[in-house]
């Protein structure tokens, strides 16, 4: 091997060592960050705005976040994560939580929220201004304890097509899906089926365009006839 060839070989090895060290350093920084964010030295019962303004595209913390306490607030956890597209369904489990208001507010790149437990006392503005949101795996209303718990929940959700499951009975006023002009037939039916039969004088609002695309007049009349105690408004 010539001297020139040896020099080339040394340079290649140095680059490989440098890249390996850089990767190791990045992993150390990653671990250090999450050791701070998810410190186990204290028992955490407050998650408000935990990831607000983060620039991640995929919500994937190092350790799972499991919440099973009615006093734990998760309001604004992902507030204004403008690049966030979705989250890891295996890393978030909100079995029981206090307010989840503004949970994903202003996540303007959010495309889907997988089916995760999300049982909270308040979903006000939870998905507001999520312009690109297409699908939500689960809408759990079983823990809501305020009449305004669904106010502005889907404000400006223009792209929303499907809510995979509605869990519990809706007894809140102000559920408004007027912006969701692409909402599918199955979601209409799930929501109407979930409206409480025991409460009177409340209103749920849908998009006239979405309704026209999903139902014949006869089908719509039959559906709303199942909940005569509710006003189903079309805008």
Over which residues does each language-model region extend?
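Residue-level detection of beta-strand scaffold positions
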Residues: 18, 97, 101-102, 124, ...
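Structural signature of tandem-repeat unit edges
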Residues: 29-72, 82-98, 108-121, 131-148, ...
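Short, low-complexity N-terminal tether/leader segments at secretion or assembly junctions of large
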Residues: 1-30
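Short, aromatic/basic amphipathic alpha-helical patches
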Residues: 214-227
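Hydrophobic, Leu/Ile/Phe/Ala-enriched alpha-helical segments that form helix-helix packing faces
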Residues: 37, 78, 127, 154, ...
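Generic structural signal for hydrophobic residues
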Residues: 74, 100, 123, 150, ...
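Periodic small-residue-enriched repeat registers in elongated scaffold domains
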Residues: 77-81, 102-107, 126-130, 153-157, ...
